[in-house]
Design a protein with these regions (language model features):
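N-terminal beta-propeller domains
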Residues: 1-82, 136-196
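Beta-propeller fold detector
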Residues: 84-88, 127-132, 175-179
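Elongated alpha-helical scaffolds
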Residues: 92-115
Length: 196
């Protein structure tokens, strides 16, 4: 038996409203609402310490890659098991990780250690991004994102209000003026860059 509930209308005035004010733990379905199911553990395995960042990415062949990071390691989750793909990191419990996908690359940084890359479908372990740099050296940064065809980084260890971007559609180029790669220090007292 289905019980009819009014449409969820939280923004409408209460006077003569025929809709619902509250819709907790449900999602909209055809002419009804369905309950959101309880969370269930995917795996009893864990990374062994506090997770400081995680990301899930899909490559060009639709394969999914799941990663999580602690202060000392970057792990890959596959078949319900975490496997270290990079160890010997030197950050502490306040150095959170940023995971960014650029094409089939996953770029990881915490602002302390050299930024890391993983080529989905090819790499076994993470490696320093500088290992594939052909022009210039990638900065050490806390935050990154993709804007159009550029990997954009910010909050560098040497300058917290600096943004720097790779060459156009090329994360191997970091030399200013080459393939449109460049950097910009943001003037004023706006503080450090916290997100891109």
């Amino acid at each position: 038996m289905q019980l009819p509930f009014g449409e969820w209308l939280p923004d409408q005035p209460n006077h003569l409203k025929q809709g619902a004010n509250i819709a907790k733990n449900v999602y909209h379905a055809k002419q009804s609402y369905k309950p959101v199911k309880s969370l269930v553990p995917y795996s009893s395995n864990n990374i062994g310490s506090v997770c400081l960042g995680a990301g899930s990415f899909r490559d060009g062949s639709n394969n999914v890659f799941n990663f999580a990071a602690s202060s000392t390691d970057i792990f890959q989750l596959a078949s319900a098991t975490f496997t270290s793909r990079k160890g010997s990191l030197t950050g502490d419990s306040t150095d959170y990780f940023t995971f960014t996908q650029f094409g089939n690359y996953v770029i990881v940084s915490n602002g302390v250690d050299a930024p890391q890359y993983y080529l989905m479908g090819t790499s076994t372990n993470f490696a320093d991004l500088s290992a594939i740099a052909t022009e210039g050296t990638p900065p050490t940064f806390k935050v990154s994102g993709v804007i159009r065809d550029f990997l954009v980084t910010g909050n560098q260890s040497s300058n917290t209000n600096r943004v720097q971007w790779s060459g156009i559609n090329d994360i191997t180029t970091w030399e200013s003026g080459t393939k449109q790669s460049d950097l910009q220090d943001l003037p004023g007292s706006g503080g450090q860059i916290v997100h891109i």
